[in-house]
Amino acid sequence: MRKVSLALSAACLLFTLNYTASALASSPSPLNPGTNVAKLAEQAPVHWVSVAQIEKSLTGRPPMAVGFDIDDTVLFSSPGFWRGKKMYSPDSEEYLKNPAFWEKMNNGWDEFSIPKEVARQLIALHLRRGDSIFFVTGRSQTSNERVSKTLADDFLIPATVMNPVIFAGDKPGQNSKIQWLQAKNIRIFYGDSDNDIAAARELGIRGIRILRASNSTYKPLPQAGAFGEEVIVNSEY
């Protein structure tokens, strides 16, 4: 009888262990929560457009003035800003107020900036159309600058149509780009930041969002499409 009891106990223990192992195997892991079709299909209500669609929308329209922001719009320039922060203010953003940083950034550090592919396509489009292209940046003005030459070289802009970069600067409480967009009669403005889109909206012109790369040093990332503006697909690079 004792042997029968031990056998039954062993069988029960084995069943319990098997059931527990089976239950553990079938339970979702916190590291692998999985997903479902509804989650995969979920999309933000954003007005996505392609470069081809932008080009089509301009068919039949005469040449016009168009504007581009620079950092995170036409250039992935985080390497220079990363270097500047480490050199001048590792624990804060004070380097952005340091004229010495801007002298470096505007006079050589863009050699480490990567031209964005979406910018190549857009600039080529507007050159084909005969549009006047202006670069309007929030960077601080410096006594000399090589940014204009870098952009002309990177995007194959002929010297005859290359306009010098406009350094609007960053003025607290102001959107410093508005006056320049107005002064140059810009009809389309491309930018990655909320300020870029807000400047265009202030003047009633077409503001088109270019996505800021997720590894940009400029954080937090903006909410593309938050103003109902057009957002270019695959424009993070």
From Swiss-Prot:
Cofactor: Mg(2+)
Compartments where found: Periplasm
Record InterPro entries: Acid_phosphat_B-like, HAD-like_sf, HAD-SF_ppase_IIIB_AphA, HAD_sf
Highest taxon of the lineage: Bacteria
Cofactor: binding details: Binds 1 Mg(2+) ion per subunit.
NAD listed as a keyword: no
Signal sequence annotation: 1-25
UniProt: substrate binding residues: T137, G138, K177
One Pfam short name: Acid_phosphat_B
Binding positions (Mg(2+)): D69, D71, D192
GO terms of molecular function: acid phosphatase activity; metal ion binding
Active-site residue list: D69 (nucleophile), D71 (proton donor)
Keyword vocabulary terms for this entry: Hydrolase, Magnesium, Metal-binding, Periplasm, Signal
EC number: 3.1.3.2
Magnesium as UniProt keyword: yes
Subunit structure: Homotetramer.
UniProt similarity note: Belongs to the class B bacterial acid phosphatase family.
The protein's role, per its UniProt record: Dephosphorylates several organic phosphate monoesters. Also has a phosphotransferase activity catalyzing the transfer of low-energy phosphate groups from organic phosphate monoesters to free hydroxyl groups of various organic compounds.
Stated name of the protein: Class B acid phosphatase
Organism name: Citrobacter rodentium (strain ICC168) (Citrobacter freundii biotype 4280)
Lineage: Bacteria, Pseudomonadati, Pseudomonadota, Gammaproteobacteria, Enterobacterales
